[in-house]
């Protein structure tokens, strides 16, 4: 479970911003929505609000970039650069400074802190700590690219791993690839227990989950679709062979069609045929019709694949992060998804959901605690984005019945400044 993520010098984020999933003990409302990790109460859901281009996506992208760099570090060639690193552009001094990422998390009952700093050429700093008690214990530290510090009882063994590492690779990944027990579980948290999604990634992973779905997932998916008033009573799912001539006739360029055929032959590419079953009343009575999923609304597609993803997360104590979760979804559907994470019968493993949105229709203290609501605001005069929580405001301007109205009135910032008085239509 994620406790905290911090980043700096990434895209519009110049100075360090922190997203905390640790519940504020002074917020007493909806304590039954919290999940427990050791001695800490954690949020199961966090929402990030803000205007368009305020930087909401950038903090989520920072997490995505860090996770990608960790997962694929060991595949990086010695001469490969780190093009994913994107420093703040509107200050020339920041171009020469590293981008920083820091995670605090709990995995398999242990609390860890892992972070690194990198530019587009190499890893500048890196560290991993484990909390055996209330204070962190060093597993390793790395400074100035290749200056390592290890506990005395691990120094000889860890130095052997360090000799196998390169300046553009993360020691966490390199040591794990050589079966280092101390780094394996922290690495596996990044490999398996946290993911950042946009719609295409939801669709891609959802397809794989549905392809392997057991009866329990199928029943859960259909019940959710029915409860959400989609009038879908079933679905069919087929994996189709890739036939080049069919792809060419559909208008796909020959080269791409041939590439898909080769991928399918090698077990990498697949075509899926999914249809949703509807019951429609006709003059002759009720009839069953099947509609290809791609002809359903984007919201139907998103909920179809998204529910599969969420169910899998709830079975595996996963933290899922979704950019613009509300896109294409009715607010009531989004509320239902959020409430799934609060439901202890459904969310038995304490899965977490973090998402960005600018849909204020469900911005309410009936659906969120104060410490679950974050705002991202951009100062366009200098190009910097900052992140802060509704919980940072004193109690007086935060009333249970007017959070949405107060936000629209600008009391919490993070709204667009619109001036159309001189506009000629």
Predicted regions and their residues:
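Conserved P-loop NTP-binding catalytic core
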Residues: 36-47, 51, 60-113, 119-123
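Short acidic/polar mixed-charge low-complexity motifs
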Residues: 13-15, 108-112, 122, 134-136, ...
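Short polybasic amphipathic segments
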Residues: 5, 101-103, 123-130, 273-282, ...
């Amino acid at each position: 479970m994620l406790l905290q993520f911090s980043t700096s010098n990434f895209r519009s984020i110049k100075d360090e911003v922190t997203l905390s999933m640790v519940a504020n003990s002074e917020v007493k409302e909806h304590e039954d929505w919290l999940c427990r990790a050791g001695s800490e109460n954690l949020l199961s859901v966090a929402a990030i609000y803000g205007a368009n281009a305020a930087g909401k996506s950038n903090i989520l992208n920072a997490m995505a970039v860090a996770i990608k760099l960790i997962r694929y570090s060991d595949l990086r060639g010695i001469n490969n650069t780190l093009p994913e690193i994107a420093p703040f552009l509107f200050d020339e001094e920041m171009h020469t400074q590293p981008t920083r990422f820091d995670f605090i998390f709990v995995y398999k009952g242990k609390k860890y802190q892992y972070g690194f700093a990198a530019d587009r050429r190499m890893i500048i700093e890196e560290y991993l700590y484990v909390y055996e008690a209330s204070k962190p214990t060093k597993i390793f530290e790395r400074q100035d690219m290749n200056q390592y510090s290890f506990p005395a009882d691990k120094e000889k063994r860890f130095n052997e791993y360090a000799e196998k590492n390169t300046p553009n690779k993360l020691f966490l990944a390199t040591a794990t690839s050589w079966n280092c027990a101390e780094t394996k579980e922290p690495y596996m948290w990044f490999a398996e227990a946290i993911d950042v999604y946009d719609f295409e990634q939801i669709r891609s992973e959802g397809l794989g989950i549905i392809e392997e779905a057991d009866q329990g997932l199928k029943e859960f998916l259909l019940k959710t679709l029915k409860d959400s008033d989609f009038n879908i009573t079933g679905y069919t799912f087929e994996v189709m062979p890739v036939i080049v001539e069919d792809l060419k006739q559909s208008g796909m360029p020959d080269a791409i069609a041939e590439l898909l055929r080769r991928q399918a032959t090698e077990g990498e590419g697949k075509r899926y045929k999914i249809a949703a079953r509807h019951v429609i009343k006709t003059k002759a009575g009720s009839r069953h019709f099947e509609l290809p999923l791609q002809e359903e609304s984007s919201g139907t597609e998103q909920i179809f694949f998204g529910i599969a993803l969420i169910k899998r997360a709830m079975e595996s104590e996963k933290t899922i992060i979704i950019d613009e979760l509300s896109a294409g979804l009715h607010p009531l559907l989004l509320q239902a998804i959020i409430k799934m994470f609060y439901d202890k019968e459904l969310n038995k493993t304490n899965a977490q959901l973090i998402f960005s949105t600018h849909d204020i229709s469900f911005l309410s203290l009936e659906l969120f605690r104060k410490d679950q609501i974050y705002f991202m605001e951009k100062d366009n005069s200098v190009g910097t984005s900052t992140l802060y929580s509704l919980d940072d405001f004193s109690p007086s301007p935060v009333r249970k019945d007017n959070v949405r109205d107060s936000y629209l009135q600008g009391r919490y910032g993070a709204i667009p400044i619109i001036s159309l008085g001189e506009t000629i239509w």
